[in-house]
Each structure stands twice: as C-alpha cells, then as structure tokens.
Amino acid sequence: AAVANNPAHPAARRLMLTGYNPADAQVAALPPCHVLAQWDVDHDRRALSCQVVQRSADVYLGLPYNVASYALLTHLLARVSGLVPGTLTHVIGNAHLYANHVDQAHELLRRRPMASPGLRISHVDSTGLVYRDLRWDGQRFGLTCALVPRSFLPLQPDHCALVDYLPHPALSGEVAV
C-alpha cells in the first residue's frame, strides 16, 4: 500500500503506508517488522508528523535504521507537500536485544551523545504529483490510490546528506537468526 493522498490536503489524517500484505503471509520468512505508518498534518503549524507501528524490533541492529528511514521519509513527504517535518512517534510491540549484541549495547550506553546532524535534501520539491492506481491483478487485491511526487522519481541517494555529522567509531554486530 502507499500514501493515499496529498499531505497538504485537509483530510491528510488518512495518509498511511502498510508493510503487511496478507497474500504474502504464507510465503514470507517473517511477517514485516514495521507494519504501519500514518502521517498527520498539523495545519496550524504546516507540519507533517508520522507515527510508526512496529511489530518487532531488533533494538541494536534494526531499530536505528527504522527510525532514520521513517524520519527521512517524513522529511521528504513534508518537502514535496510544502510542509515542515513535525514529530516522529514510534510504537514497538516487541523490542528485543539479542545476547550477541549486549557488549555493543553497553558500549553505546557508555558513549556521550554527539550533536545531532542536519539534513540536506536537494532535487526534491513540491512541483507536481502523479497518481498511480494499484488494482486487482487476478491474484492480489491492492486497490490503493498512491500519490507519487514527480520529484521523487529521479531521487538518488546523493540527493540526501547529513550535514555536520560527527559519529563515534562504528560498532558492528552479527544478525541474529
């Protein structure tokens, strides 16, 4: 499923993205971890906020990427809609730290937080939107009206950059299965 309508629209509380497809439930190795995101516009502040519902979270390896990716997506959607980013609320059903990540987690807790970096987004603006309608294909039902900003179509990784990012040395960890 995809974003249902323009975030600048007055009824924008219906903006949702779902990672769960019942048709895939029997063939997927695992159900999706982050299953739902909903965006909401505060029209007084002209701000777009996001709430993410996550079924399961690997706190050390997965959660930081989940938070960063939904924050970036919210920034991008706000940009193409002429809004400012609002808040990100993240609800986790089952948060877990695997035994093989405990030492790295202790090291993270010992570290003093660095200043938050800025985010630079280029080549993304609010210059038009294209509607894409997903329909029944004979096997799967996906009737969702997706709003795809034209300016997203040529989006490349180098169009987004962290500014003044001063990280601690990297910590690694093996994926737990």
Language model features: what each stretch is:
Residues 1-177:
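Terminal, non-catalytic protein-protein interaction segments that mediate quaternary/complex assembly
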